[in-house]
């Protein structure tokens, strides 16, 4: 097992349902520590830049529109195999295919409004964390 960091975003649909605390509790109960967090209202430029890898995909415009429709909570999670653990907690991208008890099965309504985002690899995690946080904003959690 390896100590990792991963980026997690609680998306506008979950923020508007007021389930931020419930989602964070799931991360912590699974052994993940929040080492950076903030609520932000993304601009079109910020959302478009974050999801730039999808720019040529047909859903890109709708994704940017959704991600700017309300505030999001962006956090860095740290723990043993944090990337895989977070993705397991999130569940399948399509909440209809997500296992019962996962974040998306419990809080998402559609593949478009699917409650959370999580990094899919160490390279993505490093890039995504740097997109939202300066190194000085990520705290060491020794205790």
UniProtKB/Swiss-Prot annotation:
Its cofactor is Mg(2+). Its main location: cytoplasm. ATP binds at residues 11, 59, 87, 93, 104, 114. SMART domains: NDK. An intracellular protease cleaves Ndk to a truncated 12-kDa form that undergoes autophosphorylation almost as efficiency as Ndk does. GO terms for biological process: alginic acid biosynthetic process; CTP biosynthetic process; GTP biosynthetic process; purine nucleotide metabolic process; pyrimidine nucleotide metabolic process; UTP biosynthetic process. It catalyses: a 2'-deoxyribonucleoside 5'-diphosphate + ATP = a 2'-deoxyribonucleoside 5'-triphosphate + ADP; a ribonucleoside 5'-diphosphate + ATP = a ribonucleoside 5'-triphosphate + ADP. Keywords: ATP-binding, Cytoplasm, Kinase, Magnesium, Metal-binding, Nucleotide metabolism, Nucleotide-binding, Phosphoprotein, Transferase. Changing residue 69 to C: Decrease in autophosphorylation. Strong decrease in alginate production. Its EC number is 2.7.4.6. Gene3D superfamilies: Nucleoside diphosphate kinase-like domain. CDD domains: NDPk_I. InterPro entries: NDK-like_dom (IPR034907), NDK-like_dom_sf (IPR036850), Nucleoside_diP_kinase (IPR001564), Nucleoside_diP_kinase_AS (IPR023005). Belongs to the NDK family. This is Nucleoside diphosphate kinase. It comes from Pseudomonas aeruginosa (strain ATCC 15692 / DSM 22644 / CIP 104116 / JCM 14847 / LMG 12228 / 1C / PRS 101 / PAO1). The lineage of its organism: Bacteria, Pseudomonadati, Pseudomonadota, Gammaproteobacteria, Pseudomonadales.
